Amino acid sequence: MLKITLIAACAENLCIGAGNAMPWHIPEDFAFFKAYTLGKPVIMGRKTWESLPVKPLPGRRNIVISRQADYCAAGAETAASLEAALALCAGAEEAVIMGGAQIYGQAMPLATDLRITEVDLSVEGDAFFPAIDRTHWKEAERTERRVSSKGTSYAFVHYLRY
């Protein structure tokens, strides 16, 4: 069975973005994201794809979800729906969903794992991660709080579905 992991950095209010960008810069989170996703298919929505500074993400199979039938994402595969994107991952052990908010919302009921970077900030934004219902998710692992090289406190948390 395909393991489906949602990976995200979330502020205390579950904000993940503002104006199609992350409202903080935590180099250690980017390093974790890269290490975790290398060699795995990553699935994202069109807006997330368009926000990437480097496209496609190297060392990963990039799959972009867009309802626009003629949408072209150079260096990536496109899919019309989350279900179609997951079907492209049929031979993989794990698919990693990397956003944005709409895709996370669609994927949450299907997810087996959550890899959340808890960012100790409360920020204004326009994109939010879905609430993590503790009746469906148990905390499997948590790092101690750390302070990034940019001065922001954070922790990495791994949740498993009950």
Curated annotation (Swiss-Prot):
NADP(+) binds at residues 8-9, 16-21, 45-48, 65-68, 98-103. Pathway: Cofactor biosynthesis; tetrahydrofolate biosynthesis; 5,6,7,8-tetrahydrofolate from 7,8-dihydrofolate: step 1/1. Its EC number is 1.5.1.3. Keywords: NADP, One-carbon metabolism, Oxidoreductase. Residues 3-161 form the DHFR domain. It catalyses: (6S)-5,6,7,8-tetrahydrofolate + NADP(+) = 7,8-dihydrofolate + NADPH + H(+). It comes from the Bacteria. Substrate binds at residues 7-9, 29, 60, 117. InterPro entries: DHFR, DHFR-like_dom_sf, DHFR_CS, DHFR_dom. The keyword Kinase does not apply. PANTHER family: DIHYDROFOLATE REDUCTASE (PTHR48069:SF3). Key enzyme in folate metabolism. Catalyzes an essential reaction for de novo glycine and purine synthesis, and for DNA precursor synthesis. This is Dihydrofolate reductase. It comes from Neisseria meningitidis serogroup A / serotype 4A (strain DSM 15465 / Z2491).
